[in-house]
Amino acid sequence: IYGVVDGLFVSNLIGTSALSALNLVYPVIALVTAISTMLATGGSAAIMRKMGEGKPDEAKQDFTFLILVNVLTGLVMCGLGYLFMGKIFGSMSLSPEVSAYCWEYLSRYLLFTVPILLMNNFTLYMIAAGKASLSLLCSVAGGVTNIVLDYLFIAVFGMGLVGAAIATVCGECIGGFV
C-alpha cells in the first residue's frame, strides 16, 4: 500500500518525472520486502517449531540470531544499494531530472533498510506468537502514518520525493514502535 499511496501523492503533487522515478526504484523496494518476508517466514516457522517442541530457550536463541541476521542483511543491502545505485541509474539513459528523483527517494529509503527488515519480521513473529490483532494494529498504524506524513511532507512542507521516502520509511517502521 505504501507504493500506491506514494504514487498518488507524487503524481498529483510533484509530477510525472517524480512518478517515473518512483516506479524505477520500486524493484529495489520490492527486493527489500521479498528478503524481509523470506527471513520472517522462515524465522517464525523455526521459532514456532521450537516452541511446539517445548524448547523455549532454543526458540529465544533462534529469535536473537534472526534479529542479528536481519541487522546484518539490512546493512549489506544498504551498502550494496549505495554502491550500485549510481551505476544502475547511469546505465538507464534517464533524464537528469528523473535520475535526481531516483537518487532522492532511494538514498533516503536505503538508510532505513535495517528497521524496515526488523519491523516486517516482528509483524510475522507477532502472528506466530498468537498476537495477530497486534500485528494488524501495527500494519494499520503504519499505513495511516504513511498517508498522513505523505500529505504533510509533500503537500504542506513541499519536501518532494524526499518527503515521500521519509513518510514511507516512517510508516514501515512505526509497527516496530507500536
Task: Please describe what each predicted stretch is.
Residues 4, 13-16, 50-53, 128-133, ...:
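Helix-loop interface residues and adjacent transmembrane-helix termini in multi-pass membrane transporters
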Residues 1, 106, 110, 133-140, ...:
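Hydrophobic faces of transmembrane alpha-helices in multi-pass small-molecule transporters and flippases
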Residues 8, 12, 45, 49, ...:
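Transmembrane alpha-helix boundary and packing residues in multipass membrane permease domains
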Residues 47-114, 156-178:
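Short alpha-helical transmembrane segments in multi-pass integral membrane proteins
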Residues 1, 5, 35, 71-83, ...:
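Generic alpha-helical transmembrane segments of integral inner-membrane proteins
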Residues 19-79, 116-135:
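Small-residue-rich hydrophobic transmembrane alpha-helices
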Residues 57, 70, 125-151, 162, ...:
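Alpha-helical transmembrane segments of multi-pass membrane transporters/permeases
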Residues 10-30, 97-101, 161-162:
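Interfacial/gating helices of multi-pass transporter permease domains
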